[in-house]
């Protein structure tokens, strides 16, 4: 079965759809013939992408939604099922970054990262999945983690913690769906993207002036350097949709680099050795 055959005519809900990977996923879903609900805290950004999709002949609805608010996410689910239709694809994508040493991280920034990156995924699952399971129709739940879900990186601890949590949440959810007899029609998958063009690093939280701002901004700069070779979001989306149809649990944008990171993580755990600082980016292919 092709992605077009699986998804055409269905409804996709994408959080964080106003930019980056979320916008790419929305564009690709629309290209497959899906009605796309674009949810974002930045209503203007979601509206721009939705208008682009409509101008190209697609069906799109933009909604302002703060995934930190469980009531807002529940209301989104109720509105979608009432006004648009049953959801075939739920993408819990909204996320933020955070730079700086953990001891320099403002409590508010820690909470923001966890609230959006982890609780936002939970709220999405809690609001939509019971409705998706209530029918026998095939449906997909994608929770967007990161290659950061299988690595340890200094100066990005809140983000890395949050993505490890999303991976664990999705693994548990997969087993719960299976144990309740819904795995024949509900497909739970985790997305582990590598560098994809977005503004996540520019909008990342920083630290207070009395912390090591130089170190925090150096890490931001290092991550921004990845943008030079980052994947186009729409290209990334195409790869993810195909992998989803192939039945994979782990969906990758950079299979070689992410696969190597997963193998490295497995080796660290199996050998029970301490984490090791890296001297180069895992996405630098020039030195392999």
Regions found by a protein language model. Give the residues of each.
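The beta1-alpha1 cofactor-binding region of Rossmann-like NAD(H)/NADP(H)-dependent oxidoreductases
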Residues: 43-44, 64-75, 107
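Substrate-binding pocket helix/loop in short-chain dehydrogenase/reductase
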Residues: 101-102, 109-111
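SDR active-site lid
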Residues: 179-254
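Conserved glycine-rich Rossmann-like NAD(P)H-binding loop of the short-chain dehydrogenase/reductase
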Residues: 32-48
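Active-site helix of classical SDR
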Residues: 125, 162
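Canonical Rossmann dinucleotide-binding motif of NAD(H)/NADP(H)-dependent dehydrogenases/reductases
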Residues: 2-37
């Amino acid at each position: 079965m092709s992605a077009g055959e699986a998804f055409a005519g269905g409804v996709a809900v994408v959080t964080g759809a106003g930019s980056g990977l979320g916008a790419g996923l929305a564009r690709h879903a629309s290209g497959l013939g899906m009605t796309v609900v674009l949810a974002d805290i930045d209503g203007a950004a979601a509206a721009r992408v939705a208008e682009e999709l409509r101008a190209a002949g697609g069906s799109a609805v933009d909604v302002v939604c703060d995934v930190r608010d469980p009531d807002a996410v529940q209301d989104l689910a109720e509105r979608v099922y009432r006004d648009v239709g049953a959801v075939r694809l739920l993408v819990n994508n909204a996320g933020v970054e955070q730079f700086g040493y953990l001891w320099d991280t403002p409590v508010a920034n820690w909470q923001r990262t966890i609230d959006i990156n982890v609780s936002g995924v939970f709220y999405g699952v809690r609001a939509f999945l019971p409705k998706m399971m209530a029918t026998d129709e095939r449906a997909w739940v994608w929770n967007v983690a990161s290659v950061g879900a299988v690595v340890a990186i200094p100066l990005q601890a809140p983000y890395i913690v949050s993505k490890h949590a999303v991976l664990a949440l999705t693994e548990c959810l997969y087993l719960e769906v299976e144990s309740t007899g819904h795995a024949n029609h509900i497909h739970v998958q985790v997305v582990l993207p590598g560098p994809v063009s977005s503004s996540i690093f520019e909008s990342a939280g920083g630290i207070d002036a009395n912390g090591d701002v130089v170190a925090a901004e150096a890490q931001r700069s290092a991550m921004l350097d990845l943008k030079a070779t980052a994947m186009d979001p729409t290209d990334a989306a195409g790869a993810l949709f195909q992998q989803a149809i192939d039945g994979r649990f782990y969906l990758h944008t950079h299979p070689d680099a992410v696969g190597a990171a997963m193998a490295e993580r497995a080796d660290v755990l199996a050998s029970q050795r301490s984490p090791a600082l890296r001297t180069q980016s895992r996405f630098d292919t020039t030195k392999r």
